[in-house]
Structures are given as C-alpha cells and as structure tokens.
Amino acid sequence: MAQTGNFKSPARMSSLGQGAAPASSGAVTGGKPREGGLKGVDFERRGFLHKIVGGVGAVVAVSTLYPVVKYIIPPARKIKNVDELTVGKASEVPDGKSKIFQFNEDKVIVVNKGGALTAVSAVCTHLGCLVNWVDADNQYFCPCHGAKYKLTGEIISGPQPLPLKQYKARIEGDSIIISKA
C-alpha cells in the first residue's frame, strides 16, 4: 500500500534528526569543502567514462572484426608431405612440352624431352614467379625479370640467387610420379 501525505512536514523532519530539513532541499551540510575544488571530480569522472566507452568500443570492434578477418584469411591447408606422389598422366606432357603439377606444397614443372622427364621447381628463386619452359631455346624462362635456367635448373643468366630445386620424375604405366631428389 502506497503512503500518502506530506513527507517534508516539520514534524517528520524534526523526527529525522538534526540537519535533515536542509539536506532534503538539496544542500549538503556537515561536510567540509573540498581542498582542490571540484576540478578533480569532473576529470576523474570523465577519464573513467572515457575508459569505459573506449573499452566497450574495443570489445565491439574486436567482436565485429574477428569473424571478418577469419573469413578473409583462409585456413592453413594441412598437406601431408610425401616422398613420392603420382601427379598426373603421361599423356598430359607430350614430347617437347611441359606442365606444372602440385607436389606436396611445391609447384613442380615437368618437361618431356624425347620421352625422358625432367622435373624442377616451377617457382623462380628471384621473386617467386612461375617459370615457363621454352622448348626452342631449351631453357626455363621467368617472365617477371628475365631469369633463365638450364633444363636441369642451373642458372644461365638473370637476377636469381639460386638454381631451381630438382626433383625426380618417371613414368609408370600411364602415370607421372614425382619424388624428392
């Protein structure tokens, strides 16, 4: 049941004790004045509020950006590294031609010269561009900066610091099998 009546009556105020009447009107009594004034109160409150708002903003930003970044960056593929792998069919690399295959985590270019297969890394050691086989010149050529390699992956000319990594390639039946050299 709700109470009704005058809560600021003189009889009620006197029963509450000394100083109750002025305090109920909004004034603070019985306290001593603050030595530094009210400057510190505002700045402490503002600093606290800035930290709270900043913290909430950071939580919102992280909770929003995390799924976006997770979506954009693909998960690391876990490729089982093997010493030997069947990568394709022999008919895919006719005489005088080449083809790039995936071997473990590496790209390997296989060249067929008169039925003999040669395999080296297809990634130029200069800046990581893919090399091409030029049968007329009997060499690999990197279109990015003009690096040239022999059939075995050795350096002919260009800015590359290292030769191409060598692999072993052979044909069994109609399958091309690449293995680590």
UniProtKB/Swiss-Prot annotation:
Nuclease as UniProt keyword: no
Keywords assigned: 2Fe-2S, Cell inner membrane, Cell membrane, Disulfide bond, Electron transport, Iron, Iron-sulfur, Membrane, Metal-binding, Translocase, Transmembrane, Transmembrane helix, Transport
Protein topology in the membrane: Multi-pass membrane protein
Cofactors named for this entry: [2Fe-2S] cluster
Domain of life: Bacteria
Cofactor binding note of this UniProt entry: Binds 1 [2Fe-2S] cluster per subunit.
InterPro entries for the chain: Rieske_2Fe-2S (IPR017941), Rieske_2Fe-2S_sf (IPR036922), Rieske_Fe-S_prot (IPR014349), Rieske_Fe-S_prot_C (IPR005805)
Family named by the database record: Belongs to the Rieske iron-sulfur protein family.
Cellular-component GO terms for this entry: plasma membrane
Documented EC number(s): 7.1.1.6
Protein name: Cytochrome b6-f complex iron-sulfur subunit
Pfam family of the protein (one): Rieske
Predominant cellular place of this UniProt entry's protein: membrane
Protein residues bound to [2Fe-2S] cluster: 124, 126, 142, 145
Free-text function comment from the UniProt entry: Component of the green S-bacteria bc-complex which consists of the Rieske protein and cytochrome b subunit and which appears to lack a cytochrome c1-equivalent. This complex has a comparatively low redox potential.
Record's miscellaneous remark: The Rieske protein is a high potential 2Fe-2S protein.
Annotated region (Disordered), positions in chain: 1-35
Matches recorded under CDD domains: Rieske
Keyword Transferase: no
Domain Rieske: 85-178
Catalytic activity: 2 oxidized [plastocyanin] + a plastoquinol + 2 H(+)(in) = 2 reduced [plastocyanin] + a plastoquinone + 4 H(+)(out)
